Amino acid sequence: MYKRQAVARYPLHTLQSIVSFSYAGASPALMGACAQREIGLAFCSPRGKFLARVAGQAQGNVLLRRMQYRVADDPSQSCRVAGMMIFGKVYNAKWSVERTRRDHAMRIDESRFSAVSDQLQGLLPQIAAETSLDSLRGLEGIGAAAYFSVLDDMILQGKETFFFRERSRRPPLDAFNALLSFAYSLLAHDCASALESVGLDAYVGYLHRDQPGRESLALDLMEELR
C-alpha cells in the first residue's frame, strides 16, 4: 500500500520469500499466512541491514538434529562435510572464471584468467583429500584470493563507480562491497529458512564452528553460492 492505494497484488503461492525494507510493515495476518506456507519473511533496515525473520513452527525431526549434532562433534565427519562445501565453492569459482574467459575473451587478459582457472583446478584434489578443518580453511582462502584477483576484470560496465579492489566489511567501503554484503545478508536469510524448513539447526555448522548468535550452518550452506 502507498498512500492507501494498492500498488500491486501478488498471489502468495507464487512467492518463495518476502524482504521488507525501510518502514514498510506486514500485518499479523500476512505474517501468519507466510509462516503457514513456509514463505520466508525478513525485515531489513533502510540501509539493508538484516533485522529479523518471521518463521513458522520448526520441524520436529529430533532424530535428524541429533545426527547433525553428532556429526558436528566429530572432527573427521565435520571435515568431510565442510570439504564438500569448499570443493563446491572452488569448483563454481573456477567455472565462473572460465565462463568469463569464454564469453569475453576480447575484453580481458586471457592469460591471467587461464592461470587463475588452473590454480583453482589444482586446489580441487587437495580439498577432496584434506582431513583437517584448519587446512581446509587455508585452501579456501587461497582459492578466494585467486578468484578475487580477477574479480575486478569480470566487471565490464560502469567501472567508474562499480569496481572491486579488496573485500571490505562493517562497513563496506565501496558500491561493490555494499552489494556483496547486502546480497550475503539476503542469502543467509534464505539459507537459514531452508535449513529450518527441513528440521536442521541453522546455528550448528561444520566449517563455521559454534559462535553465539551466528547461524553457522547457514553460512556453511552459503559457501557454494558465494
Model-predicted segments: where are they?
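A surface-exposed, charged beta-strand/loop segment in the N-terminal or early-internal portion
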Residues: 14, 21-95
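Conserved interaction-surface patches within small, structured recognition/assembly domains
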Residues: 16-22, 173-177
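Short, basic/hydrophobic alpha-helical segments
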Residues: 6-12
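Active-site helix-to-loop segments that bind/position phosphate- or nucleotide-bearing substrates
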Residues: 9, 63-226
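Conserved small/polar residues in nucleotide/adenosyl-binding loops
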Residues: 1-5
